């Protein structure tokens, strides 16, 4: 089962991916993880990524595509995978099609967790993180027992700069602008499945598992 997860920050992709991984025993792959792994291993591609990251530039499509292809050839991807954060561009989407074709595979579906701007702002701007242990809270949906204090270690809960409202709005708008062509691309290929990411995790998972059940019957 070969999947792409699409959705703005705060859509819950990580939560849904975790549940799918547990059920289907397939890896959840993000480009960030791929970059970190390549750098840690000190491979030739990893060294190139390290140089680019150190210089403050974005990793070009060609290098990202090569690293993704290398990752998808690993044994744990034989039964399938979830790609998160890739593809980000039409160029990358076309490259993914080509690399899967070479491997004798195809994409089963691009799952788009659609969430409006106000919901994303509410979810992320109410997030708090322990400055000591990194545990994540939410002042509305997952508050600590004592306001501003971590339940586990007693550390101070802080709001990360990335979680502040103006930054969240900017990130959301950039994501929608960049992702719109991808949504159309996968819609035209009849690969797009749009889920209402405003619903509860359980409601979304029920619909998602129904979709994935259809892929299993192929």
UniProtKB/Swiss-Prot annotation:
Catalysed transformations (reactions): AMP + ATP = 2 ADP
Localisation: Cytoplasm
Binding site for AMP: 31, 36, 57-59, 85-88, 92, 160, 171
EC number of the protein: 2.7.4.3
Keywords from the named record: ATP-binding, Cytoplasm, Kinase, Metal-binding, Nucleotide biosynthesis, Nucleotide-binding, Transferase, Zinc
BP GO terms, sorted: AMP salvage
Principal EC category: transferase
Domain of life assignment: Bacteria
Binding site for ATP: 10-15, 127, 136-137, 199
InterPro entries: Adenyl_kin_sub, Adenylat/UMP-CMP_kin, Adenylat_kinase_CS, Adenylate_kinase_lid-dom, P-loop_NTPase
Chain positions recorded as Zn(2+) binding sites: 130, 133, 150, 153
GO molecular function, one term: adenylate kinase activity
Region NMP: start-end pairs: 30-59
Function, as annotated: Catalyzes the reversible transfer of the terminal phosphate group between ATP and AMP. Plays an important role in cellular energy homeostasis and in adenine nucleotide metabolism.
Family classification: Belongs to the adenylate kinase family.
Subunit architecture: Monomer.
Domain remark text: Consists of three domains, a large central CORE domain and two small peripheral domains, NMPbind and LID, which undergo movements during catalysis. The LID domain closes over the site of phosphoryl transfer upon ATP binding. Assembling and dissambling the active center during each catalytic cycle provides an effective means to prevent ATP hydrolysis. Some bacteria have evolved a zinc-coordinating structure that stabilizes the LID domain.
Name of the protein in question: Adenylate kinase
Gene: adk
């Amino acid at each position: 089962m070969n999947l792409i997860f699409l959705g703005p920050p705060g859509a819950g992709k990580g939560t849904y991916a975790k549940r799918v991984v547990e059920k289907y025993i397939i890896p959840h792959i993000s480009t960030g993880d791929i970059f970190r792994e390549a750098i840690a291993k000190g491979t030739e591609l990893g060294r190139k990524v390290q140089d680019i990251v150190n210089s403050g530039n974005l990793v070009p499509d060609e290098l990202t595509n090569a690293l993704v292809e290398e990752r998808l050839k690993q044994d744990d991807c034989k039964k399938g995978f979830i790609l998160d954060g890739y593809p980000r561009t039409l160029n990358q989407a076309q490259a993914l099609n080509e690399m899967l074709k070479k491997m004798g595979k195809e994409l089963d579906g691009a799952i788009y967790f659609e969430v409006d701007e106000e919901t994303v702002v509410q979810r992320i701007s109410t997030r708090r993180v322990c400055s000591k242990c990194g545990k994540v809270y939410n002042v509305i949906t997952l508050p600590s027992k004592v306001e501003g204090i971590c339940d586990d270690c007693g550390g101070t809960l802080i709001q990360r700069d990335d979680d502040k409202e103006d930054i969240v709005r900017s990130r959301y708008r950039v994501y929608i602008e960049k992702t719109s062509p991808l949504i159309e691309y996968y819609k035209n290929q009849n690969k797009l499945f749009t889920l209402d990411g405003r619903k509860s995790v359980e409601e979304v998972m029920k619909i998602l598992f129904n979709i994935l059940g259809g892929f299993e019957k192929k």
